[in-house]
């Protein structure tokens, strides 16, 4: 469990995501489509499905390849999400005429280029917390005031780690070429799931009955089923079986491993989250550039003004390294995983170059509104940052 930046303030408690309407996220785009070109930028509202599942449904309905579909940010299945998807070689009328479960097309405008991951400014959130006390709004305002001044700890959200919270374990096994371990981690543990059929499928796998496991896995566990179909034929060919996993998912597992290591660094730096030290690689919030801190005292006013922040590692074979004690700490972390930076130079389109990620991010457009026994929070965060971190600080649960 991550520590709190606002641990001296009690939480509101309560629950959220009781209904999809309790969690609304809207992408903030960098640019709008120009009105001409072979790609259609479709703003969709999805409900109860992931971005990848939305892409599958759209691609199938339009007869295009999933890999040809572009998106700026990955969103999970919970709540309601409004985001833009790019679709090649189709007419706006085709897209606007779609009627698909879990997806509503809000607009469709042509553009010249495919939408790339990261092509968004951030996300705006409107979240309802239910079952809170009469002082919840006062508590939330106090917490958000500190987060506005010091920054939001840039932890990755739990959705980064998958339904069982094990995606980083799969990614770590891939990096160590431990494909038996990767398969075991992907199938997971029976006590991590609540679906009875899913639990029995995992237990059958653990008992070595691959055929029964394949037969028992629910249809929505598509990746597990595809992997087991290979293993049933060749039980010891773990690496070959793992190739059945969609390349996008393999990338997600590797990214989850990066995220786990980064989160550990944030935990270690929590008390000094709004400071920089000698040897840090600092991040400029106005343009995303990074530089090495050689005079921490001289840079302290810029950190206090939220112009710059210390960064942590998203490890990769070409990642810019810090110096001094910051470097020593990051290398110790890699050593605990029996890895070095060259370990991330993978083949098969899985090469991870790495980057620096700020340890904190600004929160903006803050709003708090009492709603009977509930509480509405509104705020925006930069791309790649998670609302769940803000909710943890507010709710302390």
Curated annotation (Swiss-Prot):
Q: Taking every annotated instance into account, which residue ranges of this chain make up the domain TRUD?
A: 151-361
Report a single Gene Ontology molecular function. RNA binding
BP GO terms, sorted: tRNA pseudouridine synthesis
Q: Which UniProt keywords apply?
A: Isomerase, tRNA processing
Reaction catalyzed: uridine(13) in tRNA = pseudouridine(13) in tRNA
PROSITE patterns xrefs: TRUD, UPF0024
By its UniProt entry, which Pfam families does this protein fall under? TruD
Give EC number(s), comma-separated: 5.4.99.27
According to the UniProt record, one GO cellular component term is: cytosol
Question: What InterPro entries does the record point to?
Answer: PsdUridine_synth_cat_dom_sf, PsdUridine_synth_TruD, PsdUridine_synth_TruD_CS, PsdUridine_synth_TruD_insert, TruD_catalytic, TruD_pseudoU_synthase
Q: Which residues form the active site?
A: 76 (nucleophile)
Function of the molecule: Responsible for synthesis of pseudouridine from uracil-13 in transfer RNAs.
Instruction: Return the PANTHER family for the record.
Output: TRNA PSEUDOURIDINE SYNTHASE D
Q: Which family does it belong to?
A: Belongs to the pseudouridine synthase TruD family.
Q: What is this protein called?
A: tRNA pseudouridine synthase D
Originating species: Geotalea daltonii (strain DSM 22248 / JCM 15807 / FRC-32)
């Amino acid at each position: 469990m991550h520590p709190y930046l606002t641990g001296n303030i009690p939480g509101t408690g309560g629950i959220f995501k009781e209904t999809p309407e309790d969690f609304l996220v809207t992408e903030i785009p960098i640019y709008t489509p120009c009105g001409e070109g072979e790609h259609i930028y479709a703003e969709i509202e999805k409900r109860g499905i992931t971005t990848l599942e939305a892409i599958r449904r759209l691609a199938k309905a339009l007869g295009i390849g999933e890999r040809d579909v572009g998106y700026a940010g990955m969103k999970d299945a919970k709540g309601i999400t409004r985001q833009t998807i790019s679709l090649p070689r189709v007419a706006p009328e085709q897209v606007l005429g779609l009627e698909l479960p879990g997806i509503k097309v809000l607009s469709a405008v042509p553009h010249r280029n495919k939408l790339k991951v990261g092509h968004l400014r951030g996300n705006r959130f409107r979240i309802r917390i239910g079952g809170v006390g009469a002082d919840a709004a006062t508590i939330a305002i106090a917490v958000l005031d500190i987060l506005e001044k010091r920054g939001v700890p840039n932890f990755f959200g739990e959705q980064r780690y998958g339904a069982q919270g094990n995606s980083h374990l799969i990614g770590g096994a891939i990096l160590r070429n431990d494909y038996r371990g990767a398969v075991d981690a992907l199938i997971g543990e029976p006590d991590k799931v609540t679906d009875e059929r899913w639990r029995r499928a995992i237990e059958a796998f653990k008992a070595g009955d691959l055929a029964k496991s394949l037969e028992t896995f629910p249809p929505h566990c598509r990746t597990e089923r595809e992997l087991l179909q290979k293993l049933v034929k060749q039980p010891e060919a773990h690496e070959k079986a793992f190739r059945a996993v969609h390349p996008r998912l393999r990338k997600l597992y590797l990214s989850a491993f990066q995220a786990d290591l980064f989160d550990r660094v944030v935990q270690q730096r929590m008390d000094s989250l709004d400071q920089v030290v000698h040897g840090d690689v600092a991040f400029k919030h106005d343009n995303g550039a990074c530089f090495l801190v050689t005079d921490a005292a001289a840079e302290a006013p810029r950190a206090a003004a939220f112009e710059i922040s210390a960064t942590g590692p998203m490890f990769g074979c070409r990642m810019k390294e810090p110096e001094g004690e910051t470097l020593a700490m990051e290398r110790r972390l890699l050593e605990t995983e029996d890895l070095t930076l060259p370990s991330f130079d993978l083949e098969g389109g899985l090469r991870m170059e790495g980057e620096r990620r700020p340890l904190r991010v600004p929160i903006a457009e803050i709003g708090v509104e009492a709603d009977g026994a509930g509480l509405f929070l509104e705020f925006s965060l930069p791309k790649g940052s998670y609302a769940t971190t803000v909710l943890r600080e507010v709710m302390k649960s």
